[in-house]
A protein has these predicted regions:
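Charged interaction segments
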Residues: 57-132
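Short, extreme N-terminal segment that most often corresponds to the first beta-strand
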Residues: 1-42, 114-119, 127-132
């Protein structure tokens, strides 16, 4: 049954060249990424690495992310999204954890995302910083 899902993650957008290398017609890309990085599925995962994807409504394509999922709640209420860069302390902590998967991570590539969406439709791609 469909309901709202809330996620809070430290997020790294997987580069297109990696996606292009893994993509094939026989398997779902998300399954290939789970195998490639040997991480858990995102459902109910907390304090661990997972793969998430989201539909980018601007280009109608999916974006894929390696996330350190801090929190997951099924049955949350309402749609919202917040994205910010990590503080220096957060970046120092999480960039070390992500170094297991990627050697060099730029200061602006890791983001803290906190959002809720209705899972009866495609999960949105939550990564871009919005200027106010």
């Amino acid at each position: 049954m469909s309901d709202y899902v809330r996620k809070k993650c430290v997020r790294f957008k997987i580069h297109q060249n990696i996606i292009d290398k893994l993509k094939n017609e026989d398997e779902w890309l998300e399954d290939l990424l789970l195998k490639e990085y040997n991480v858990k599925e995102n459902y109910h995962t907390k304090n661990d690495f997972t793969i998430n994807s989201g539909l980018n409504y601007e280009n109608d394509e999916y974006d894929y992310f390696l996330d350190y999922q801090l929190d997951y709640e099924y049955g949350a209420s309402g749609d919202f999204e917040n994205v910010r860069l990590l503080t220096d302390t957060e970046f120092e902590k999480y960039s070390r954890m992500f170094a297991k998967y990627f050697n060099e991570i730029g200061r602006d590539e890791l983001r803290l995302v906190h959002y809720s969406y209705y899972n009866g439709c495609d999960e949105p791609s939550i990564y871009e910083l919005e200027e106010i």
